[in-house]
């Protein structure tokens, strides 16, 4: 049987590398859990048991082994398989899994509601240190839930190298491999002793030794059982252990040591690069050449600012490389703080730095800043602290799909008191926004960065907070564009002119505050006003202008051209923008319908 499973693992690993090389995706963690997932499939019943992953980065093999093997080559493509687990995709997917820390809390709910079913949670070693996970562990131990099996996949990485005390705990447990055998021998010896007084003395000794040997003694004292597999890519080791713990009652934790990138030499050598990777050449491991991104522009500029001002600190929640901070981190390691997957903690830490006279920059993806709204309000806004927020991946992100799109942050930042919000429309404006941020002390400042290649305009005027810029001057129709939408509306400018839609185009990087002077004094020239943004339409930039119109008695038709849906699927960014009628011919048709009141 083991030879068959080994062959199966080889076939899955080959298929995985081929598909991800074409579509991009999360390769390293999935290569590491091939044997673990195959063995879980062998021992447990995926149809009857409830299997959860935290996070879904490591669930590709699970998709293949359930009901999606024939469609696996469509993963991350439009209308193909989702990049993460999705209950809308398969009955085997019990819970969505885009963000870290959700599986253990959800498992508690499943375990309570389904006492006769086994709930198996595969948790990454970075996710286990997340606050949600620790809260769930606290409850599981307190209630001694009998039907939960927690498998901690320790590959010593999240996206980059793991940080934090709990990660060090895991390393200590994994390295103390002889502990389990020692403990079993001690228990066996104690059980053979008849004298109660001697037995109690030895039991106290065993507990004392355990407190020194395993850092998880506190959890073990709450009723958890701990087991280790130190060769997590070895079927001969995995199968017997899973059989042993399958029917145990009470909360159980199995620590499995796997190798991220296992079986593909380039992924083994550069684990961070192959965590999440764009399409690449299998023979060389090299990705195909891409255009310069806004994240790169930010990374270069923040390094420059860091050299000028030693009070600048950068913070990221396990996303140093993704947010463009790797150069800053190398140059100023003592001023670049990686907090791990702990967004709320990151924001409050930054507030403490700001309160102490430092200049903190919280660099984080839009989808993850959602996890820190309480801290944004309570710790930053109410105290009006000058914390700078660099919100990367704002707008549609593409292949990572609905759990990762950055289409909510603008709405809640507009709602929170004291925040200034900038959405640069060009690479030059991004640099200017960062230059302004260095000495900005009026309160918290947000600078939003899209997942897009850079765009610039010749002879562009400098960025000013509270002031917009006229890019094209025309008549009848006014287009106010923020962020990426300036590039998009300029792409169709000539076609609009040719169709008789004459217009003025405004670059509006300053979203909060608005350019009230322009709105009060120049709006009356136009028959139609369009506000273009890559954000969910509710409580949007356009809504803020609409409210300003209402408050100031301005009676002009205002059309909000934004994302109509709050849940955008996965696919290429260009495809999704066109589907949302925010690009190209579909945008032109949308504008015509709004002007003429009918479909043309």
Swiss-Prot record:
One cellular-component annotation, GO: cytosol
E.C. designation(s): 2.2.1.7
HAMAP family in the record: DXP_synth
InterPro entries assigned: Dxylulose-5-P_synthase, THDP-binding, TPP-bd_CS, Transketo_C/PFOR_II, Transketolase-like_Pyr-bd, Transketolase_C, Transketolase_CS
Protein name as it appears in the record: 1-deoxy-D-xylulose-5-phosphate synthase
Record has Transcription regulation as a keyword: no
Recorded GO MF terms: 1-deoxy-D-xylulose-5-phosphate synthase activity; magnesium ion binding; thiamine pyrophosphate binding
Cofactor stoichiometry and binding remark: Binds 1 Mg(2+) ion per subunit.
Pfam families: DXP_synthase_N, Transket_pyr, Transketolase_C
Gene name tied to this protein: dxs
UniProt pathway: Metabolic intermediate biosynthesis; 1-deoxy-D-xylulose 5-phosphate biosynthesis; 1-deoxy-D-xylulose 5-phosphate from D-glyceraldehyde 3-phosphate and pyruvate: step 1/1
Keywords: Isoprene biosynthesis, Magnesium, Metal-binding, Thiamine biosynthesis, Thiamine pyrophosphate, Transferase
Swiss-Prot/TrEMBL catalytic activity: D-glyceraldehyde 3-phosphate + pyruvate + H(+) = 1-deoxy-D-xylulose 5-phosphate + CO2
Annotated PROSITE patterns: TRANSKETOLASE_1
Residues binding Mg(2+), per UniProt: 125, 155
Family of this protein: Belongs to the transketolase family. DXPS subfamily.
Organism this protein belongs to: Fusobacterium nucleatum subsp. nucleatum (strain ATCC 25586 / DSM 15643 / BCRC 10681 / CIP 101130 / JCM 8532 / KCTC 2640 / LMG 13131 / VPI 4355)
Names of the cofactor(s): Mg(2+); thiamine diphosphate
GO biological process: 1-deoxy-D-xylulose 5-phosphate biosynthetic process; isopentenyl diphosphate biosynthetic process, methylerythritol 4-phosphate pathway; terpenoid biosynthetic process; thiamine biosynthetic process
């Amino acid at each position: 049987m083991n030879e068959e499973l080994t062959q199966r693992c080889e076939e899955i690993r080959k298929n995985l590398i081929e598909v991800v090389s074409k579509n991009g995706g999360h390769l390293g963690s999935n290569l590491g859990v091939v044997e673990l997932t195959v063995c879980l499939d062998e021992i447990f019943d995926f149809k009857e048991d409830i299997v959860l992953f935290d996070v879904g980065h490591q669930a590709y093999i699970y998709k293949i082994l359930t009901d999606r093997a024939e469609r696996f080559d469509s993963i991350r493509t439009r209308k193909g398989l989702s990049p993460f687990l999705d209950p809308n995709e398969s009955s085997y997917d019990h819970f969505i899994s885009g963000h870290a820390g959700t599986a253990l809390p959800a498992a508690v709910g499943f375990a309570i509601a389904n006492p006769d079913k086994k709930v198996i949670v595969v948790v990454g070693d970075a996710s286990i240190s997340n606050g949600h996970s620790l809260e769930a562990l606290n409850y599981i131990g307190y209630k001694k839930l009998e039907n939960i099996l927690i498998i901690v996949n320790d590959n010593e990485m999240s996206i980059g190298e793991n940080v934090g005390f709990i990660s060090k705990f895991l390393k200590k447990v994994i390295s103390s491999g002889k502990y389990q055998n020692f403990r079993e021998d001690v228990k066996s010896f104690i059980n053979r002793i008849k004298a109660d007084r001697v037995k109690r003395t030895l039991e106290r000794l065993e507990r004392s030794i355990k407190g020194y040997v395993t850092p998880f003694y506190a959890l073990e004292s709450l009723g958890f059982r701990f087991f280790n597999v130190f060769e997590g890519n070895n079927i001969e080791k995995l199968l017997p252990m899973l059989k042993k713990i399958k029917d145990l009652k009470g909360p159980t934790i199995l620590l499995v040591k796997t190798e991220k990138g296992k079986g593909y030499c380039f992924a083994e050598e550069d684990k961070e690069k192959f965590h999440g990777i764009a399409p690449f050449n299998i023979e060389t491991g090299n990705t195909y050449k891409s255009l310069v991104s806004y994240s790169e522009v930010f990374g270069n500029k923040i390094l420059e600012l860091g050299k000028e001002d030693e009070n600048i600190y950068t913070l990221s929640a396990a996303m140093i490389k993704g947010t463009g901070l790797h150069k800053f981190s190398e140059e100023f390691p003592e001023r670049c703080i990686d907090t791990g997957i702990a967004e709320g903690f990151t924001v409050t830490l930054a507030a403490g730095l700001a309160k102490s006279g430092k200049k903190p920059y919280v660099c984080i993806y839009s989808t993850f800043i959602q996890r820190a709204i309480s801290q944004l309000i309570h710790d930053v806004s109410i105290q009006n602290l000058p914390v700078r927020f660099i919100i990367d991946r704002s707008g549609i992100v593409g292949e990572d799909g609905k759990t990762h799109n950055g289409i909510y942050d603008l709405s809640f930042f507009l709602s929170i008191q004291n925040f200034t919000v900038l959405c640069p429309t060009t690479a030059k404006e991004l640099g200017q926004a960062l230059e302004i941020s260095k000495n900005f002390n009026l309160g918290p400042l947000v600078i939003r960065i899209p997942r897009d290649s850079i765009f610039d305009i010749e002879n562009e005027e400098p960025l000013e907070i509270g002031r917009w810029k006229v890019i094209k001057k025309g008549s009848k129709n006014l287009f106010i564009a923020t962020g990426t939408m300036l590039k998009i509306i300029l792409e169709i400018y000539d076609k609009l002119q040719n169709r008789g839609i004459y217009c003025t185009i405004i670059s509006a990087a300053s979203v909060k505050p608005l350019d009230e002077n322009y709105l009060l004094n120049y709006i009356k020239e136009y028959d139609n006003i369009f506000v273009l943004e890559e954000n969910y339409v509710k409580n949007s930039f356009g809504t803020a202008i609409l409210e300003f119109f209402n408050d100031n008695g301005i009676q002009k038709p205002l059309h909000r051209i934004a994302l109509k849906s709050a849940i955008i699927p996965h696919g290429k960014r260009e495809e999704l923008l066109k589907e949302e009628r925010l690009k190209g011919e579909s945008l032109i048709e949308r504008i015509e319908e709004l002007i003429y009141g009918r479909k043309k």
